[in-house]
Amino acid sequence: MVLYMPTEVGNEANPKNNDPYWAAKVSFGISVSATQAMSESDSFGNTYDEDAAAILSAISFSSGKHEITQNMQASGRFGAVQAERTAQFTINADVYAVYTKDASGTTGGAMAVSADGNSKVIINGGDFRQVGVPADDPVCDLIYALGNAQIEINGGTFKATDPTRTLNCKDGSNAKITVKGGSFYKYDPSNPTLGDNEVVVAAGYHVEHNGDWFNVVAD
């Protein structure tokens, strides 16, 4: 809205004695009637949030086959994705694990994926990260397996607050994480730092180092 001073107005419109109280003033109101469009459109474009998390609660199953294709941001206390007993998961989505403490407030976790029992998780793609891990509690596994669980990684990007805990299996368990692809931040899955024979790069694959990232590719 633009207001114009009439061109015929002269110096008599100036305030008396330069006192702002006497300055000319205009008061008006505006009423807008609008119809909401069927699609979003704003200064950021209508696709700026297309990769936003669609799932905001942890997912847990103890049986059956399940596929995750929508991006997640959920509590990582016990795993944003929790595979238990005989459950089987296939993941091709971003999974952001939010640091969460237990009820006592003494211990916390930020696991993107946790597999237990005889479960199996196949990760084909996505971005896996931790959110809000405090500096005084960086010991949080990103991808974790225990029991007899099996995790297979075919692709995706993985970045943990403490890179040494990107992939981990519980000591003394029969769990295993097999890597056939993916990019890992400051973590070499062919030379893991936590436990022997827990994390393995599958035969026919090798690691290529590129800056801060370790990429698993076929021979």
Model-derived regions: residue spans:
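Generic short beta-strand segments
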Residues: 2-8, 70-73, 94-98, 127
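Short acidic, Gly/Pro-enriched loop/turn segments at secondary-structure junctions
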Residues: 40-44, 102-104, 190-191
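Acidic Ser/Thr/Pro-rich low-complexity disordered segments
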Residues: 44-46, 61, 184
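Extracellular/surface-exposed low-complexity segments
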Residues: 53-58, 155-156, 160, 168-219
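C-terminal, structured domain-capping segment
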Residues: 1-56
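Extracellular beta-strand/beta-solenoid scaffold signature
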Residues: 53-60, 74-82, 100-116, 131-146, ...
